[in-house]
């Protein structure tokens, strides 16, 4: 990627490269929670396919989740450093050198090289877990795995603490379609006779007897045979898990009640969101998961948009029925070839950006005031003046934006 590319040009080149690699497994480090979200939204705003890395036989995987699961169940495979409070640290720039991998100063290319090296070591030292990671990088394979194994084992991380669970697959969420598992640390007999109302009260009281598997986010699922070699669970607990799973398997009524429970919780969640703010409060830039998918006709217009010149793209933007796509298209023309816009439209977009950037309130986006504070923070932290060139360049950009939108 050349430095003089615009954001749109960079996104187009990334898309072309990813398509050239496809079908592929796209692996990163904390990429599903961070990099992938940034990438998806960048593609979305550029009228490209935001789900490119998970469609058309493409899959995605996250090495951070794999390391957390591996360290929990098989802690001697990869070395994980600890901080001064004796807590394990999974930051890439610390895990890499701790395992003898040069990290290349935590720049983008260095992160890629370090991720590749860690992946190679996991594949060599824990081939079964590596295989499980690759299998679970595909949604359909996760569902197959759950249906084929009466008991599965997985980990969850909250506030830096990773915990292991054994669970039995019950149902898919009636709204969100995620697989729902019964947590086998609970006794299913305690729940079989409960009404939906009682199940709900029990769940909301803090007894989280059901667990959600985000099957589109590369969960690492392990079998009983794999976990028996771990030592994380007591053998007596594993025997009890087998008995509990058989109880669940023989009682379909609990699955029906769980579906009703999930429906109730989802309806309450929707009602709460409606009371807190309507769909009208959601900006186009944050609507990737909230505004639905484009119609077939809008998808066709998107394809025409890619092939057209900038003059033709303005007329295509007016044909979108999805107002978000029209908005993004107009913004792209404003940024890339503003001469193609009528003066009134160009002025409206310019003023909208000006209002956003000049706001002195706490906003969902970065304002010029936020930008200036970031520059000041970099200056304070740069005690040896090693970032002088970067700071100078950032100040020039800030000055340019101030003059452009004053």
Where in this protein do the model-derived segments appear?
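Helix N-terminus capping/helix-initiation residues
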Residues: 6, 183, 195, 251, ...
């Amino acid at each position: 990627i050349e430095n003089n590319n615009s954001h749109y040009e960079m996104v187009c080149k990334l898309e072309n490269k990813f398509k050239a690699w496809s079908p592929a497994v796209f692996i990163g480090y904390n990429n599903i929670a961070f990099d992938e979200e940034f990438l998806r939204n960048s593609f979305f705003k550029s009228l490209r396919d935001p789900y490119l890395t998970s469609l058309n036989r493409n899959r995605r995987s996250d090495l951070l989740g794999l390391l957390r699961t591996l360290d929990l169940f098989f802690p001697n495979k990869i070395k994980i450093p600890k901080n001064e409070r004796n807590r394990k640290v999974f930051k890439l720039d610390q895990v890499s050198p701790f395992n003898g991998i040069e990290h290349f100063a935590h720049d983008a290319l260095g992160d890629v090289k370090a991720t590749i090296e860690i992946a190679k070591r996991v594949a060599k030292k824990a081939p079964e877990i590596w295989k499980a990671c690759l299998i679970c990088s595909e949604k359909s394979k996760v569902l197959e795995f759950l249906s084929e194994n009466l008991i599965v084992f997985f980990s969850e991380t909250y506030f830096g603490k990773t915990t292991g669970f054994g669970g039995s697959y019950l149902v898919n969420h009636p709204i969100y379609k995620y697989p729902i598992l019964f947590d086998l640390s609970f006794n299913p007999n305690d729940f079989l006779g409960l009404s939906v109302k009682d199940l709900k009260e029990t769940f909301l009281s803090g007894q989280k007897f059901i667990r959600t598997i985000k099957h589109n986010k590369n969960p690492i699922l392990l079998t009983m045979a794999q976990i028996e070699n771990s030592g994380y669970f007591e053998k007596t607990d594993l025997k009890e898990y087998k008995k509990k799973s058989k109880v669940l398997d023989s009682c379909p009524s609990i699955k029906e009640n769980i579906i009703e429970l999930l429906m109730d919780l989802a309806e309450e969640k929707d009602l709460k969101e409606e009371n807190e703010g309507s769909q009208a409060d959601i900006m186009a830039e944050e609507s990737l998961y909230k505004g639905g998918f484009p119609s077939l006709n809008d998808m066709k217009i998107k394809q025409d948009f890619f092939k057209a010149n900038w003059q033709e793209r303005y007329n295509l933007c007016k044909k979108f029925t999805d107002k978000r796509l029209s908005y993004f298209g107009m913004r792209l023309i404003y940024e890339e070839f503003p001469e193609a816009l009528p003066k009134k439209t160009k002025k409206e977009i310019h003023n909208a950006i000006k209002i956003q950037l000049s706001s002195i309130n706490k906003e969902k986006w970065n304002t010029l005031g936020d930008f200036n504070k970031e520059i000041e923070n970099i200056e304070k932290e740069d005690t040896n003046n090693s970032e002088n060139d970067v700071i100078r360049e950032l100040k020039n950009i800030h000055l340019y934006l101030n003059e452009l939108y004053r």
